[in-house]
Each structure stands twice: as C-alpha cells, then as structure tokens.
Amino acid sequence: MSAYQDQRVVVTGAGGGIGAALAHRFAAEGATVVVNDLDPAKAAAVAEGIGELGGRAVAVPGDASAVVAEAREALGGTIDVYCANAGLASGGDAFADEAVWEAAWDVNVMAHVRAARLLLPHWLERGSGRFVSTVSAAGLLTMIGAAPYSVTKHGALAFAEWLSLTYRHRGVQVHAICPQGVRTDMLTAAGSAGELVLAPTAIEPDAVADALFDGMEKGRFLILPHPEVADYYAARATDPDRWLSGMNHLQRTWEAR
C-alpha cells in the first residue's frame, strides 16, 4: 500500500505544469487531492482528469493564500500534505516596478508563510505533516534577467529551510523542489534567458513528480530533478567568485543575443 493512500493533499497552482503532475501522482498513489488554481476552468479540468483515471480530486479555485480553509472543508478534515506550488515568474532587473517586486514576494514567499501559519498548529498537535515547496534552481543559484523571481525564490527556499530545522523533530517533513528548466508555460515566460540557460536541459513535469516521490521516500529536503544542480550549488558555495564570474559570462552572452 502506498504511503499516501487515503491522505488528504492540497496542490496549489495545479491547473497545469508541475502542479498538475503532482496532483495526478498523489491521486495515483491513493490520496484525495485538492486541485487549486487561479483559473477555475483549469482546476476543474485537472480534477476531472484525475476522476476519469479512477482517482479522487476536487477543484478549489482561487488565490493560493486562501486555499487552506476551503480545502479543509472540501476534504472533510485535516490536510496531510500541502504542496506550495503556485509561483510567479517575474522577469526584470533592479529597476522592475515596485508592483512587480511586491507581487513576486506575495506569491513566491508570503503565500507559503500564510499556509504554514494555518497548517502548523494541527500538524504540531498530532505530530505529523508534510510541506512541499516548489522553489526552483533559481532559489539555490540565480536566474539571469529575472531579479524579482530569483530573489523571492531564495526567500522561498530560506523559509522551507527554516520550517525544516525548526519542526522536523516534531514530525513535520519539508521538501524543497529545485528544478531547472521544466516544459511548462513558465519556461516560455522566461523568454530568451530561458532559451539560453534552461531550454537545452528542460524536462517534463512528470519527471519533477518522480523526483519528489523518490526524495520523499528517502527523506530528503532538497529535491533536485536535475542532478547537475547539486554540482552548481557546491561550486557556488566553495568558490563564489568563480561562480559569479561564470554567471556574468552567461549574462554577457544573453545581452549579446
């Protein structure tokens, strides 16, 4: 029997891409899944698709920040696994509009914080719960041409780390998914920077779900669907000046395109 049989799972941003892949995989493992997305039609389509395959899912559209209470009502009980997958791919540099920075911070960081505030009291009381944060390799490294995205993804990773180090001894398991390019609408939104850096090694959303389930089974915090990211992360930590020089070379290549 799957470890997720009859568990109650929420996946935000699940109308397509990585979120839809996670929702389908949890349902295939026997969980009841809340499919959340800002687009009601997309959320409904994914939930219906899961149902057609014999799984259990309900669409709860709307802002990810407000989904926890509605999901509890829809599930008729507690939430066992929360996948904070909704994200905002904000390009731009330091001069990006204040509204762009604020939106990226709200979606990529504060939505996770707000969900955790609502989930933690019950998880700590019962001694179990699982928080999955879809971060990005940009949260471990950076992404050229996308300052708001890179900075807020670092924030998402930092919050996931804090949750793990603070509550793991009390039964709360935390996982941070940090892929590079994934063939989703967000990759297209990355524009020429995505074409230069991400597209050549892009993977399918299902591969991200596979990596998560492998990592959860092994109790890993960092989920790296692209194994080479571990090497980049190590290089950044051991010789940051060399790493920054290499990234600046990519920046100059991108500017010359």
What is each residue range found by the language model?
Residues R8, G15-G16:
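Conserved glycine-rich cofactor-binding loop
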Residues E29, L141, W162-Q173:
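Active-site-adjacent segment of SDR/Rossmann-fold oxidoreductases
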Residues A47, G51, V58-G77:
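Conserved amphipathic alpha-helix within the SDR
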Residues G87-E102, E125, G145-P148:
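Conserved mid-core segment of classical short-chain dehydrogenase/reductases
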Residues A116, T152:
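Active-site helix of classical SDR
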Residues S136:
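Residue(s) in the substrate-gating loop at a strand-loop-helix junction
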Residues A176, S192-Y232:
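C-terminal helical subdomain
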